[in-house]
A protein has these predicted regions:
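Repeated scaffold domains used in trafficking and secretory/extracellular systems
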Residues: 1, 58-65, 105-115, 151-161, ...
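Short coil/turn segments that connect the beta-strands within blades of beta-propeller domains
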Residues: 5-6, 70-71, 116-118, 164-166, ...
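Short, conserved, GDST-rich strand-edge loop motifs in beta-rich repeat architectures
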Residues: 11-35, 78-82, 171-187, 243-246, ...
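Blade-loop segments of beta-propeller domains
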Residues: 24-70
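A short loop-to-beta-strand structural motif that recurs across blades of beta-propeller domains
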Residues: 28-31, 38-41, 87-89, 129-131, ...
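Short loop/turn segments that connect beta-strands within beta-propeller blades
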Residues: 43-48, 91-96, 134-138, 195-198
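A short beta-strand motif characteristic of beta-propeller blades
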Residues: 48-56, 97-102, 139-149, 201-212
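Loop/turn-rich, solvent-exposed surfaces of beta-rich toroidal or solenoidal domains
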Residues: 151-201
Length: 256
């Protein structure tokens, strides 16, 4: 999710047929591709839809986290399964016109633009691999092989480039609870990733949840400077959701 001025841009998927897991891998996949349509929405602070465009083609219909480079929105749309394929689009926020910039033989689930280097960075399914591309005109050129993410703490859902060759990523991980009762514990958090090294330099669990118990960082977010601190917008629910707004204050200010 990206905030430009007083409005927001949000990628979303409309699933018409969920994926089905195979009993054993087939052609390197653990599930079928399912079916659906990818969307990019433009809406205001009240949730009123202003514009919408479809994104993707065929079985490539699942958009991931998006970022803004000051001119273009960058959106990756992938098959809804790991180890698959993606199309990276650049979208003009003024006209909502999308142009293909690259195709990737992997599921790219989040993008972040580093303005200091003119580089686009991406994370794979589960955030296990980190990719780099140089923006060259209307196309992207891969920079080196994918790098392994040394952190297993979060599955990035959305990322954004910040100062000094770093990106801020939000996400969630699910852990099965032991014992006969079982159940799942979902942990949300934020990571500040050093883009030069391809590794997080700061990790912050986010303990705030929605009324129904969803981690605040389960889906897209946007954070920017606000006064002496930060302001964050979070949209954790699937389907119909609520845009949560939180002010993040320095520790001394939050205690006053």
């Amino acid at each position: 999710m990206v905030r430009i001025g007083e409005t927001f841009y949000l990628s979303s998927v409309e699933v018409s047929r969920p994926t089905t897991r195979f009993s054993a891998p087939r052609n390197g996949f653990d599930r079928d591709p399912g079916a659906g349509v990818g969307h990019l929405f433009h809406f205001d602070g009240t949730g009123r839809l202003l514009r919408e465009i479809p994104l993707g083609e065929g079985t490539i219909y699942h958009p991931g986290g998006i970022d803004f480079d000051g001119r273009w929105l960058w959106v990756a749309v992938a098959e809804y399964r790991p180890e698959s394929r993606s199309i990276i689009y650049r979208v003009d926020p003024e006209t909502m016109q999308a142009r293909e910039a690259a195709r990737v033989n992997d599921h790219v689930g989040a993008l972040a633009y580093d303005r200091s280097e003119g580089m686009l960075h991406g994370a794979s399914w589960g955030s296990r691999r980190l990719y780099r591309w140089k923006v060259r005109g209307e196309r992207l050129a891969a920079v080196g092989p994918a790098r392994r993410n040394p952190s297993f703490y979060l599955d990035y859902q959305d990322c954004h480039g910040v100062d000094r060759q770093r990106m801020l990523c939000g996400g969630v991980s699910s852990y099965r609870l032991p014992g006969a009762a079982g159940g799942v514990f979902r942990l949300g958090g934020l990571e500040l990733v050093d883009l030069a090294r391809g590794a997080p330099v700061h990790q912050l669990p986010v303990e705030v949840s929605t009324p129904e118990g969803l981690p605040l960082t389960q889906n897209p977010f946007w954070i920017e400077r606000h006064g002496d601190g930060l302001r964050g917008w979070f949209l954790p629910q699937d389907g119909r959701g609520t845009l949560f707004v939180y002010d993040i204050l320095p520790r001394s200010a939050s205690r006053s």
